[in-house]
């Protein structure tokens, strides 16, 4: 869950620009990894994932952005527990897609309404279930990239989802090959994808942008260090940042990098 922790810290810590960190209230639920997180308004939501006793979770908690306090919110419906899902937000509604539970790779999509504190089912992805897919949002649509499928192979598929029509559309495949556990975000009119693993478990350091207007991917300067997975990628004040992750030696990383778009280069923070 490194990218969730990174997002929480940077969302609430005004001293980030001095390159310092602040400790926040600990997560009140059971310890877990492979969870999802998203931000609605000023509040941060964290849920799903895998517990220390290898049980998929469906509970969710909200951190109040004003006072930093946690409280439980509606869990996903019974039987919908999962790990390695992907989450995104469109028009103050959160969505949780896919993942893995009890040997099954999932292709379902769930919508969370924070006003009603209610989960509702959306149309399933019209393709194989997958875990560890990446997602970003552009122009009111979500884009789901890659993921690991039941045959243990990663995927290069890209799908867009329109919540207005509750419909899925295939897009140009990811040119970096089959990938899962990548990091993704959007900034202005482009989506971005960094890191991940392929079906041979090779760790990747490639970096791409995606333009939805022409349905086209463009290679950007690769990350200047060995590849990783489980990392964070986010946009803040017109800049892109990447943090944390896991490398090929199974080591957890704590570094923070900035992508300088003007000079097309990576800078350690």
Language-model region placement:
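Sec-dependent signal peptide recognition
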Residues: 1-10
